[in-house]
């Protein structure tokens, strides 16, 4: 009797344990994935990052940290359709209306993931973010993301900014390993209260260790360099100020202008890759249709050239390894078609960009980046421009406040071009401002916005009489007349025989550092630390009675 009773008790325990096992999440631990290589792009021109496979796609770590001009918005060609994400290499589909957790063991950074990545134009995905927000995130991952119905979703975790920053600082040749946990369940649980998918009565939990090696680092360098180009009605370009990156050039039968437009550094561990392509693309569709493919060409050395024609012509990663620059050639017909299309007074960063395509990763292999250097393209007939005398788009200064401290001085070159000299030329300074006792001051602020400090500002120029003329210019957007400046005149003649003049002068914008008013904030409080401000200087020219 005692033996039978013991046997019945044992059977009862076995049945109980079997019942509990059948009601638990099923856990699958896969073999470690083979190490894969990636290429990291640090874009200093647009302040974002891009990561893309250097070899095979899976396990995935691919995509940009920010949307670019290639973002799909519901119409047109589909290029960039999500931000960057990771997975365990199995690209496992998710069930609609289930909940999903993803967390990392040995995570490279704290808070590495922001939520469930999806394709932005699929039903149930946010077109603006390509992200399904979880109920909660923590130092290891995210929990309780509701899988929306509609388009397919996969076990993909969107990478956070801190994840990209970790990849940025990794040395070329370095590797990182992490164990990815991905779990989905039909049970509706409250992740914000601490519940997790792996603890539910049913579901599927997958575990896999992945390793990624940084095979290359491509850094796109923003030089802030500016060059002026004036074009006549025939499209013939004339170089203005800051022309060190450009030269007149003839390629075959086409004459025009070639300019160094991208500066980069590329470090690698010997990676060989031909699936990564770069090429330029014209942003204006009408202009792109009007010009021929050889009217805009690009080169890695300024000697051998490829035409710009969609994705047909490109340079590969392997070809980029032998260079550090990208050059663009613009034919006279390119500029002529700009005039015909009514495109003038434009910065090349608004005219074209460079595209990056990795054919290995079709959904997240598209990326776009701006040029390192900029051309300001102006019509030679009736135009005005202003450019820093350092030929940079973003001149900066810093200094200390107090008696005897030197002013922050910014020098500019103003150019007008037309059939005659301009009848009126005006200049103004825009920026944060504060009026005190009837006078406008430029307003500098601390990073947290608590300290706001007034600074006087001045514009000064040399007049035709040789005297120095000074204007109070406290960032108040008030136009000041500079028509009587001392202009250096250069005559020009078009191929058609039309004549005109190009006039240049210099102007200085100064912010004194020794004015007593800047020792206190606008609330009349003392301050200590750093304050900053940014603004713009605008010019305007008027021609009258022109035939």
Predicted regions and their residues:
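Bacterial N-terminal signal peptides that target proteins for export
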Residues: 1-7
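Post-signal peptide N-terminal segment of secreted/secretory-pathway proteins
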Residues: 69-171
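N-terminal signal peptide c-region/cleavage motif recognized by signal peptidases
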Residues: 18-20
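Long, charge-dense tracts
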Residues: 296-319
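N-terminal small/polar-rich segments of proteins
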Residues: 23-93, 155-157, 161-286, 326-462, ...
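Bacterial N-terminal signal peptides
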Residues: 8-16
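Amphipathic, heptad-repeat alpha-helical segments used for oligomerization and assembly
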Residues: 487-525
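Outer membrane beta-barrel transmembrane domains
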Residues: 447, 452-493
């Amino acid at each position: 009797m005692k033996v039978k009773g013991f046997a019945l008790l044992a059977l009862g325990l076995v049945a109980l344990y079997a019942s509990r096992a059948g009601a638990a999440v099923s856990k699958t631990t896969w073999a470690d994935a083979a190490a894969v290589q990636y290429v990291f792009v640090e874009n200093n021109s647009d302040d974002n990052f891009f990561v893309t496979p250097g070899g095979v796609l899976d396990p995935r770590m691919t995509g940009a940290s920010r949307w670019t001009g290639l973002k799909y918005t519901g119409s047109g060609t589909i290029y960039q359709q999500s931000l960057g994400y990771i997975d365990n290499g199995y690209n496992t589909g998710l069930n609609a209306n289930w909940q999903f957790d993803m967390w990392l063991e040995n995570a490279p950074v704290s808070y590495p993931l922001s939520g469930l990545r999806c394709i932005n134009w699929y039903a149930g995905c946010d077109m603006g973010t390509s992200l399904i927000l979880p109920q909660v995130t923590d130092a290891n991952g995210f929990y309780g993301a509701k899988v929306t119905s509609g388009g397919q979703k996969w076990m993909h975790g969107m990478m956070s900014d801190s994840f990209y920053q970790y990849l940025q600082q990794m040395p070329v040749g370095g590797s990182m390993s992490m164990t990815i946990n991905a779990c989905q369940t039909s049970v509706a649980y409250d992740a914000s209260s601490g519940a997790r998918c792996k603890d539910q009565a049913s579901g599927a939990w997958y575990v896999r260790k992945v390793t990624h090696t940084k095979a290359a680092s491509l850094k796109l360098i923003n030089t802030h360099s500016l060059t002026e180009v004036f074009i006549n009605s025939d499209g013939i370009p004339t170089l203005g100020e800051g022309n060190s990156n450009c030269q007149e050039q003839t390629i075959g039968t086409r004459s025009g202008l070639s300019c160094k437009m991208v500066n980069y550094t590329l470090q690698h561990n010997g990676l060989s890759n031909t699936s990564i392509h770069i090429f330029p693309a014209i942003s204006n569709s009408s202009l792109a249709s009007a010009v021929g493919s050889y009217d805009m060409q690009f080169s890695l050395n300024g000697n051998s050239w490829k035409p710009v024609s969609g994705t047909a012509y490109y340079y590969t990663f392997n070809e980029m390894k032998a260079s550090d620059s990208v050059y663009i050639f613009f034919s006279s017909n390119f500029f002529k078609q700009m005039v015909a299309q009514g495109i003038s007074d434009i910065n090349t960063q608004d005219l074209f960009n460079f595209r990056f395509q990795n054919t290995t990763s079709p959904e997240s292999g598209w990326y776009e980046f701006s040029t390192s250097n900029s051309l300001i393209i102006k019509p030679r007939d009736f135009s005005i421009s202003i450019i820093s005398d350092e030929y940079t788009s973003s001149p900066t200064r810093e200094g200390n406040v107090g008696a005897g401290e030197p002013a922050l001085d910014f020098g500019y070159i103003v150019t007008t071009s037309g059939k005659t000299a301009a009848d009126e030329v005006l200049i103004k300074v825009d920026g944060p401002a504060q009026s005190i006792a009837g006078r406008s001051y430029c307003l500098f602020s601390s990073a947290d916005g608590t300290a706001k400090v007034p600074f006087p500002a001045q514009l000064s120029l040399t007049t035709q009489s040789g005297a120095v003329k000074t204007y109070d210019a406290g960032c108040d957007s008030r136009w000041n007349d500079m028509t009587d400046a001392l202009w250096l005149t250069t005559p020009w003649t078009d191929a058609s025989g039309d004549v005109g003049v190009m006039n240049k002068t210099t102007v200085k914008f100064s912010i004194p550092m020794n004015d007593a008013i800047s020792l206190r904030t606008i609330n009349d409080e003392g301050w200590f630390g750093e304050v900053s401000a940014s603004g713009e200087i605008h010019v305007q020219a008027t021609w009258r009675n022109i035939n």
